[in-house]
Amino acid sequence: MYEFTGTDGQKALLSAELVDVTAATAEQVAFLNEQFDKDELKGFEISFIHLSQSKVSGDPVEFNSDYTSFKPIDAQGQRVQDVTVIGWDECTTESFTPEFDTGESITQCFIAAAPAGGNAPAGVMYDGGYEDPNPYDYYDGKPLLFVAE
């Protein structure tokens, strides 16, 4: 669990749990390769990381989000390249819905790219985003790690 601070200073206690880390299919990799210029993903293995989130308590946070505060990591907690795609139904992230605000969980999807044979994605870290002060900061704090066992 972690404390989320919204854009207008709202505070809520959120729960997050790693659901899975799965390899992209050949069709998904082909689609992603079509979306990027200059073979940017060539030689990379693509994975999807799914994270379940729910609100435990606190202020209303609907229409806020914190998915940009999660970054792919390997089993040692080191950053892995993330891939951002907007509007792709096969891997979505969303803002907190009114239903989320009343306790319903949502599942976020993150895309990771690792060199073939390199540090395989094993989860995500939460770095607290732009919160100030930020106890979860990647450089000056202690990010929360959600890693597959």
Q: Predicted regions span which residues?
A:
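Conserved functional micro-motifs across diverse proteins
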Residues: 1-48, 54-149
